[in-house]
């Protein structure tokens, strides 16, 4: 893997193409399973697929950054099922479709660390200490990285799965706790030195920091032509 490692800043820059006007424009990346008006919306060179477009239907031709829903794969999925939610792993085929898109078009998939989707789809869990390792499917690479290094107020340990792209050296290992800057109603929680994630809303927890988003887009823009995409 050493031959494909690059500095993170170089990876974030990605590849560009020349537009008709002679100006460089970023290579188009399809952002799958993203929020309307969220981090990937209205960006040059990004084709966002929100819930209304149904990213399971994506048929190319661009490399992808995929954020498939994680609720049915997280540690609390069983508890949620006991209270009426769908069964663990029953995500309507979203993860499987995202995995297929990354394998066919190249790119990177993001999920919370310890996601049960890895085992369910035959992928090897990456070491929490960081570093890219083979995913065990003869196709992709996987790693663990904390988004706290990239501006998320929580640590937010994350697993990535990448195919056909350059693999940048990321900020490996534990990230420092970030101070929580919520309203005064949370002052007693700050005084008690509680983790930010414990007082964050769901929307705050799942947001992708701009620096991490740009890193993923930069990786996808290095995607090489995939044999199955012909």
Predicted stretch roles:
Residues 1-16:
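Compositionally biased, low-complexity flexible segments
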Residues 15-230:
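Class I S-adenosyl-L-methionine
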